[in-house]
Structure formats: structure tokens, C-alpha cells
Amino acid sequence: MYYGFDIGGTKIELAVFNEKLEKRYSERVDTPKHSYDEWLNVITHLVQKADEKFACKGTVGIGVPGFVNQETGIAEITNIRVADNKPILKDLSERLGREVRAENDANCFALSEAWDKDNQQYPVVLGLILGTGFGGGLVFNGKVHSGQSGMAGELGHLQLNYHALKLLGWDKAPIYECGCGNKACLDTYLSGRGFEMLYRDLQGKALSAKEIIRCFYDKDESAVKFVELFIELCAISIGNIITALDPHVIILGGGLSNFDYLYEALPKALPQHLMRTAKVPLIKKAKFGDSGGVRGAAALFLSRD
């Protein structure tokens, strides 16, 4: 059996999958906040409980909201302070008596979608999350590509280019500071939060993403104008990503992925921002929703070989 963990700041979820990645069991508990040892104990207990339930020693994959150095096993997960800068791979492997693998949660999202039966034919799968933040994960032939320092796929920290700034109006363009310390990162524009901030700063009034989208479908002139600008901003930025990575398929997740107009408008807007010989990848909505994190974590042990 394959065990997948989605570890967040408030909840830890374990899900158990068979070799076809069909879920057989899941459990959620609160994330310990008092000590690293307590955090390790909770994960250990969940694994032992699953081992007993299924009478086996399952593989353990973990998705975290941060980075894990694959050489040292040390995690950088600042919103889970008890486990931040700790050697989680070494410590969990010793406690559980087996190899433990861990990846950024966006990579797990992408991996889950790459292992869907409808996507397994594609050698290069790019997952993009347009949620609270904007980020992604890159999968080559069923395996996460995270790079030498675990930063591959951190597309939210690419910055607006010439064409994006021109679209937003040069000296009128709102320049947002990112939590990473830089300015004009895609995370602050293409996320749900960025969608709302841009509308506020360009249209002069504050609305939620849901309200903006409702106004768009009601054919409100300012909302229609803004959405078309946002689609163009996405096309410019995602076009750059396609030029660099040339994926066969892009899977969208996060709150804005529920905006159906994206799937109609974005493929039409992309070609003018690509090389003439480039193919526009298939753009699809994520299938597994909230289960994608645990499913992708479990898939860290799968191989197409």
C-alpha cells in the first residue's frame, strides 16, 4: 500500500492508496504546534495505525508547504515552526524503519494529476495552482522534477516581464511586494489574491474573486474589461513558462481554476506569446481537488519503468 501525507499548518491528513492509486482509507488530525518530537510522534502513530489496519508496511510519501532538500532531508516549512529547518526525512525514516520521501505540496498536486489515467500518456505535465498563491509543479515521465535545491516549479517567483508591464500601463502598473522579498513576482498577480488586488487597483473598487466573476458573467463592463486584461496577463506569463518548459499538458488547480472562461480564453490568447513553431499545450482543470496532495505524495513511490 502507498501512504500519502498532506501536512499543513493546521491539519495533517493521511490517505492510503492501492497500486492503482485508489483511496482505501484516510484520517485527519490537528497539526501539533508545541514540539518537533510531538509532530514526529503524530505521523509515526498514523503510519503504525495504517500498517496494522492493512497488515503491511506501506511506503510513506509526504507533501509539505515548503521545500525539502533531498540531499540533507532538511525541511524549510516556515508556517510549521516545530518542523522548520529539521531533518524530517532522516528522523521519520529512523522512526518508521523505511524510506520516507517528501516534496513540496504543489509538486504533489502536479504528480497526482500526472498519474491520472487520462494524463499518463504525456511525458511532460505542468501543474499550476491559481489559489491563495500562484505556483506550480513539473513532472517528467511520472517523476517530480524539483531541481538541485528543490526550487524547480517555483514559478510564482518569476517576475513580470516587459510585455506584462506594458499591458498594465508602465508607470500606472501596480507593483506588489512579494513575501519572498522581491517585487512584481507572478505570485502577487496570477493568484486569487492578486486577481482581487489588481481589480481593486485598476478598477478602483474592492470585490472578491467570486464577485468579480459574477459581474463578468452579468456582462458588467468594468468586470469584462478587467477579466480580458487578466487573461492576457496570464497568457504573457504562462507563455514564458511554456517557452522554457514546453509541457504537453497544463493542469490548473486552486480557486481560480473553477473560472470556466479560463479554459476557453487562455488557449486562444497564448499563441501570440509563443514561438511560431510552438504548440499550445492542452489546458485542463484538476481532477482530484483536495485529494490531490495526499494522492501525489503517495505517488512519490510509483514508477513508469
UniProtKB/Swiss-Prot annotation:
This protein's pathway: Cell wall biogenesis; peptidoglycan recycling
Gene3D superfamilies for this protein: 3.30.420.40
Species per Swiss-Prot/TrEMBL record: Histophilus somni (strain 129Pt) (Haemophilus somnus)
Keywords attached to this entry: ATP-binding, Carbohydrate metabolism, Kinase, Metal-binding, Nucleotide-binding, Transferase, Zinc
Entry EC no(s): 2.7.1.59
Residues bound to Zn(2+): 157, 178, 180, 185
Keyword Flavoprotein included in the entry's annotation: no
Protein name as catalogued: N-acetyl-D-glucosamine kinase
PROSITE patterns, alphabetized: ROK
Pfam families registered for this protein in UniProt: ROK (PF00480)
Role of this protein: Catalyzes the phosphorylation of N-acetyl-D-glucosamine (GlcNAc) derived from cell-wall degradation, yielding GlcNAc-6-P.
Family affiliation: Belongs to the ROK (NagC/XylR) family. NagK subfamily.
Gene: nagK
Residue ranges that the Swiss-Prot or TrEMBL entry lists as coiled coil: none
GO molecular function: ATP binding; N-acetylglucosamine kinase activity; zinc ion binding
PANTHER family for the chain: N-ACETYL-D-GLUCOSAMINE KINASE, ROK (REPRESSOR, ORF, KINASE) FAMILY
Binding of ATP, residues: 4-11, 133-140
Catalytic activity: N-acetyl-D-glucosamine + ATP = N-acetyl-D-glucosamine 6-phosphate + ADP + H(+)
Keyword Manganese: no
One Gene Ontology biological process: peptidoglycan turnover
